[in-house]
Amino acid sequence: MPPNSVFLLPVLCLIVPIYSRGFFGIPGDYCSVRTHTCCENRDDDCTVPILGDHLCYCDMFCDRGPDGGNDCCPDFEATCRGKDIQNDQRIDGESCSMDGDTKEKNCEKCTCHNGFWKCDGTACLIQPDILEKIHTGRYSWSARNYSAFWGRSLSDGIKYRLGTLFPERSVQNMNEILIKPRELPEHFDARDKWGPLIHPVADQGDCGSSWSVSTTAISSDRLAIISEGRINSTLSSQQLLSCNQHRQKGCEGGYLDRAWWYIRKLGVVGDHCYPYVSGQSREPGHCLIPKRDYTNRQGLRCPSGSQDSTAFKMTPPYKVSSREEDIQTELMTNGPVQATFVVHEDFFMYAGGVYQHSDLAAQKGASSVAEGYHSVRVLGWGVDHSTGKPIKYWLCANSWGTQWGEDGYFKVLRGENHCEIESFVIGAWGKGSKRRRRFKMRKLRRFRKMFK
């Protein structure tokens, strides 16, 4: 027997189960959104991304029968063969042949018992029935299935995709900075005013670190703006996550006031110095720039090996009034602000438009409902006229990567404290050279004169 054949069989054993499993049951538009929806015969370029870095196929070769495997896209049968596959997706209550067999339906585990499939009823992050109702109903926003969220439980999403703990009473009651109103345009986008000084959308991954990611994102933007671009680093959310662990919960959430305390007292290095890794590990990790290193004569050492270990500090944060006009004026004058809001189960499926929380999950029962606090950057505002009725919105940058929402951004109803989006809004100024500090003090004095 040739030596090569010894190694061929194990490889085939690994490949066949993957193909035979296929991508069936993952809702969403795949073949149907291609320019040329389906391809005749075999076409290895007739693909659509699915489940992160995987590909599914829309060519007639993708379904090679039970022995040949199946790597077709989930909507292949409906789009390319015109078959109604709705009934095929129902598992719970259907008959089965072997007691003890198990299947997965989205995030649910289904077991064959007494000749019938019984699923455990776990609420999933992607709920196909809600997707369908949003698609066919009259809503101000659209929804879609995200392959990165498919197969994940709702509780898992709340735990690892959010991460801001509800502010303590003393923090909620902090004094608000009042701002003299100014003439406000119908639309404003910080990216238009400050361009490259506004940093791109982050991706917190599977770590409940929005408390860290949003704080460093706001700091990065504000430092760049107040320094007029002389400081334009993306600050390290990993350092804040790993090193600010006193009374924090790492990848299971944190308090914004303690995050701001750390960045004010010690400062945070750039992301190039201390890159983000917790999105894959689900752990905050050990602090690689301990507090004692700040007094080291040799300076801080970058975990990445970079020679640039400059640490940047911020001034004490301030709470912006919850009045719509005050938030707008602060945003247009000083840059993006940090907002905490309540994320409900349907928000995970947001694709575009002006988000307004629906009661579709509540209609199904309490087990389909969940919520948690999340913090994001607010970059601007506008008015949506697409539905025939003007809808005011806030423009926000989420931290779920650019594949989610509108390239990582979302719009949410403005002026009604929807999902508490206007209840806890934070701003801060960056610390820099003495010249910049004097500039900020003069700026503060000008603000104080406004209020006299």
From Swiss-Prot:
Entry keyword set: Disulfide bond, Glycoprotein, Secreted, Signal
Gene Ontology CC entries for this record: extracellular space; lysosome
Coiled-coil intervals: none
Domain SMB: 34-85
Keyword Secreted applies: yes
Pfam short name (any one): Peptidase_C1
Record carries keyword Lyase: no
Main location group: secreted
GO MF annotation terms: cysteine-type peptidase activity
CDD domains in the record: Peptidase_C1A_CathepsinB (cd02620)
Glycosylated residue positions: 145, 232
Xref: SUPFAM superfamilies: Cysteine proteinases
Compartment(s): Secreted
Stated family: Belongs to the peptidase C1 family.
Biological process, per Gene Ontology: proteolysis
Protein name as catalogued: Uncharacterized peptidase C1-like protein F26E4.3
Domain of life the protein comes from: Eukaryota
Record-annotated disulphide pairs: 38-46, 38-58, 46-80, 56-58, 56-73, 62-72, 73-80
Signal peptide: 1-20
